[in-house]
């Protein structure tokens, strides 16, 4: 059992999603007391799939989740990219054992709720407080007061905002607004037995086409297949973030695509339609006693499948630095932002670029992209992501 030091300031984590729970688990492992304040009354026991790449899988293993991931997740054998019209192969990235040998961990496919449950199991009872919507923070030289929607307040030595792209703490610290990317996504789950030939071997499939792309992979423990169908949508009500997909809406958006895509989308009993937002990747989200993590700090479009992975990296680096800090957390929080900002800026930039590349209309640029893909999508080409070691101090 990790010894909790009484000499360090208690940390309040706002938000109990993947980012918040990983921050809490990492802090506790570093011997730092923390409380997670979650606005929901209960955690949802559902959700779409999520890809856990080796860069964050190694961290989850260090936190003690190797067994849970092997039980609840699927190891992907490959990432395959295909053409929208006829399903012709464009590229294949070998994963499986080559990935473990090269990067020290598998590439996992898991339902978001299962990863969330696994992280929650690392936390002692009482660490997470539900129905705790933080509405305001007041920072002082010696601490922070948190005020909640029910009129109560709490004191903390440090506050970490892990409350997602809608982050109230982000609004307090930075003051910018989310930016609509021009893309929306239909996400859904399909019973795997309705697609028997598509995933005989567990893998991630991409189909690229004009103004859109489709991603799909199995979530084997539940006998499900996840899909995300992204389309260019110049117009979207900025006040609406998501809504149930109307019957036939996703199928109509991808009419004319190959039979595999039609079968996949057509097999979904229900889907949800989301607008994809991000923000410019700017700094200034750390003060002497407050900072951000995950989408609150650096929301990004999902075209490198790195959003949650970067949140997990954030958590490990932040806890590593605070675990080595003295009673003044300010230098550790500033160093955390200094270390993370170049990394997340690069992932953020390349994610935006990849969205443009994925959606090229048929023509000279698309043909150039397709010709270059076999030599640009090899396992070694992802070393900058998968091989990144998020451990600045190395004390753990």
UniProtKB/Swiss-Prot annotation:
Its EC number is 1.14.13.249. It catalyses: 3-amino-4-hydroxybenzoate + NADPH + O2 + H(+) = 3-amino-2,4-dihydroxybenzoate + NADP(+) + H2O. Keywords: Antibiotic biosynthesis, FAD, Flavoprotein, Monooxygenase, NADP, Oxidoreductase. Gene3D superfamilies: FAD/NAD(P)-binding domain. This is 3-amino-4-hydroxybenzoate 2-monooxygenase PtmB3. Pathway: Antibiotic biosynthesis. The gene is PtmB3. Residues 352-371 are annotated as: Disordered. GO terms for molecular function: FAD binding; monooxygenase activity. Part of a gene cluster involved in the biosynthesis of thioplatensimycin (thioPTM) and platensimycin (PTM), potent and selective inhibitors of bacterial and mammalian fatty acid synthases. Catalyzes the hydroxylation of 3-amino-4-hydroxybenzoate (3,4-AHBA) to 3-amino-2,4-dihydroxybenzoate (3,2,4-ADHBA). Binds 1 FAD molecule per subunit.
